[in-house]
């Protein structure tokens, strides 16, 4: 089968690009013919205040950089390129209404089957006319694959039945790490907050929980690893005001894959104090390194964490509850049993299974 992908791929960084690459690679292993119709430019600078949109990643799969979603003249060129390649299936990566006009134009004109792979239905930030934009982009899809039950419910709540009934429940597979570094025992307990930092991810909640955690575990260390969408000043000020400098280590930058393993190897547990969520690539990354997770029980996060076996779930936006879970994690010595549980479950929900679901 000839399978085309529409959306970001290397050298664009981020979870959407990474997900598409893993899935495309799996299709290639299954002997399908792949073509990536990549973005030439993804966002104008005003919509991406966290700096460079690129990293050093690359792909051996065939890829052409054509689409600039905010430049209409690129839409017809991308459409023609897809049609000339004559795919049997087009998989479009979706996560923001920003792409609705360009995607809608292309998807309603291609002559192959269309699957929208929806990482979100309701965006984390408010967008004017979200329902109208979603309807326009999604109405040409033969199927809409979502990655959590929460996302499927959002689809049914947001769009009319003639579109939402095309929804199919998929899942976010566990990533294959570049290298699985076993946990390295540290001189102090180590928490990890990882990934692109936006307000909805609740880093402020974690920082407010840290003084409570420190009372019980004086030598606790939190590593914050990821670029900030906007300014890091708000978090730096909180760290100073809460007198956390001795307990918090900040790496406010994008971390390439080659460094990721090191941060997980020296961390006891990954913290996801999200205020809202659908699912999270950070969970898939943490599980790939057999790192337990403490996360807010919001959206689809609970679907990927086996409470008290691979991690702990806490109420969202609740620093005392988050602190209590971290303290319990250490007091009850949960790390090693959770690592063993994660290792035993890593062979489920694979990329091969997701690829088969999409083909079927």
Give short role names for the model-derived ranges.
Residues 235-258:
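Nucleotide-activated donor-binding/catalytic signature segment of Leloir-type glycosyltransferases, i.e.
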Residues 262-278, 291:
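Acidic donor-binding loop of glycosyltransferase active sites
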Residues 17-22, 198-212, 284, 320:
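A conserved mid-protein helix/loop that constitutes part of the nucleotide-sugar donor-binding site
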Residues 219, 334-348:
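A short, well-ordered alpha-helix in the C-terminal region of glycosyltransferases
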